[in-house]
Amino acid sequence: MSLSADERKAVVDFRIEKARRAFEQAQGVVALEYWETIANRLYYAAYNAVSALLIAYGYSAHSHNGVIHLFGQHFVQPGIVDVKDGKLYHRLFSMRLTGDYDDTYGLTSDDVLPLITPASELIDKVIELTNTKMAEIKDTPEE
């Protein structure tokens, strides 16, 4: 993906806004106890934040598994992001799959509630890394 600095900033800003909105949606549904919906919104909040990070660094993924792989390869393995945060991101993905597609198991408060604060912290860390990188980028196309 070849983007100018302005284009990259626009895409990254959009993803960050989507991450924040999805997290707010997750919080807003807690009182209704829609555990699958909360799991879905937590995952998509993290996914959009991680996607923004990858785009800021010029990485391009074409699937959810690709985003997980690139996040692990470029941020978790080198120690930029803690291993526990990489595992949390993968857990959010797995929980979203269970909530969206598993016809034999319904998520419960015990599955979902303990992940809200760690997900918020992960999203904040990833957005901070993204913003730091974006501050370094000049208005030149990616090579």
Where are these regions (language model features)?
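Terminal alpha-helical segments
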Residues: 1-143
